[in-house]
Amino acid sequence: MSTEANKALIRRHFAEIWNEYQLHVADELVSPSYHSHFPLPGQPPGIAGFKFAVQALRTSFPDLSITVHDLIAEDDKVAARLTARGTHQGSFRGIAPTGRGVEWSGIRIFHIADGKIVEHWANWDDLGLLQQLSAR
């Protein structure tokens, strides 16, 4: 695939799977052998693990929205600079729902092969997110 096609795949990944919560689209865009280098506790391997992560975050933040600010592609990799926003309405990392609106930023790098996401790396501002969720 071209770098533009790879970027389009990642745009669709965020728009349809994460923002519109159309989890079935993962079957089209994510490889069965998908590997996360940033797994959640208890996340299984493969596409089941990808779906697990989406469901877990959407349970904690049902109105989750991810804004893609930049996509940079080279060969079979796409890097994305992102901002996530949501309302904490379900338990997250042992923190009971607070009802607070939160926002955190991150960078993700995707490896694409045969038109599907096969692995990804992530770096999110977890400290900033946890500070927003904790009592002040």
Segments (PLM) and residue ranges:
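C-terminal and inter-domain tail/linker signature
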Residues: M1-R136
